[in-house]
Amino acid sequence: MNRTDELRTARIDSLVTPTELAQRYPVSSSVASHVTDSRRRIEKILNGEDPRLLVVIGPCSIHDLNAAMEYATQLQAQRQKHQARLEIVMRTYFEKPRTVVGWKGLISDPDLNGSYRVNYGLELARRLLLQVNELGVPTATEFLDMVTGQFIADLISWGAIGARTTESQIHREMASALSCPVGFKNGTDGNTRIAVDAIRASRASHMFLSPDKDGQMTIYQTSGNPYGHIIMRGGKKPNYHAEDIAAACDTLHEFDLPEHLVVDFSHGNCQKQHRRQLEVCDDICQQIRNGSTAIAGIMAESFLREGTQKIISGQPLIYGQSITDPCLNWEDTEVLLEKLAAAVDSRF
């Protein structure tokens, strides 16, 4: 009889279960309290109950745990310095969506060489999240598929659904089940309506199929996530200007949704020129000083060193520099946070 299935499967490996990984790297009571408390603070900011600004900042992607921990340690000092005005959360992205092909992130390929040791990647991701949370720094990530979140979602304070997946039904269903607030990016073309539709969908109850923590395929029924919000990330042109934010708020108002959103300084808003994040910051700071209450948060890409580098076989990587999107350096990061904190002063 002719085979009709798995004709294009080149390799199958066993995967550790979320329960097994959590037993290996358990959440302490102090970390559990930290995650719970940071989620509540973020929810209050997104609801307009707290006038402070949510700041999701960090490397475009995590590839080196030592550099990530050095960044997290320095970020914790900034958290303490600006805590009266900013709720700073570290961007800890382990999965990278690709328009065509490329390195897909630490979880998929932790060795950066196409060996795809996913079990090791999941272990590194969970270990890092525990260490960063133990420092007192909340973590943020993008949820790219329906499985890997089961391994790390208990350590995440804020989640994102990316521009390429906001329109996806399964991602909207997953967001309705997540225990943290979730931001939906506008489409890569700049369309914010799909993000509003995603917010509406994620607030509803859904049923979907997914593995549970023990790897058993399960039917999940969700109660809905009331903390979905738009991330303005630009598109063919930037959409961080006051008129863009007003237009997005009009759409939110049309559907009786909270008129609070997050502005991404990178991606389409900086037109892929990382230093323009500082220009976007200046504009957003002025909008806040002018009385904007719609801007509840911002996102920015920064690391220890400026720019980006390519992975070249046989050549060592530059420590503390991105291997995906170019980032601001640490000195610019401190300036950016100082400017944001000063602008938010006007809300008090």
Curated annotation (Swiss-Prot):
The keyword Transferase appears for this protein: yes
Alphabetized Pfam families for the sequence: DAHP_synth_1
Statement: the UniProt record of this protein carries the keyword RNA-binding: no
Reaction catalyzed: D-erythrose 4-phosphate + phosphoenolpyruvate + H2O = 7-phospho-2-dehydro-3-deoxy-D-arabino-heptonate + phosphate
The protein's Enzyme Commission number: 2.5.1.54
GO molecular function: 3-deoxy-7-phosphoheptulonate synthase activity
EC top class named in words: transferase
Pathway: Metabolic intermediate biosynthesis; chorismate biosynthesis; chorismate from D-erythrose 4-phosphate and phosphoenolpyruvate: step 1/7
Keywords assigned: Amino-acid biosynthesis, Aromatic amino acid biosynthesis, Transferase
GO CC annotations, alphabetized: cytoplasm
Family recorded in the similarity comment: Belongs to the class-I DAHP synthase family.
PANTHER family named in the record: PHOSPHO-2-DEHYDRO-3-DEOXYHEPTONATE ALDOLASE DAHP SYNTHETASE, PHOSPHO-2-DEHYDRO-3-DEOXYHEPTONATE ALDOLASE, TRP-SENSITIVE
Record-given protein name: Phospho-2-dehydro-3-deoxyheptonate aldolase, Trp-sensitive
Organism annotation: Salmonella typhimurium (strain LT2 / SGSC1412 / ATCC 700720)
Organism lineage string: Bacteria, Pseudomonadati, Pseudomonadota, Gammaproteobacteria, Enterobacterales
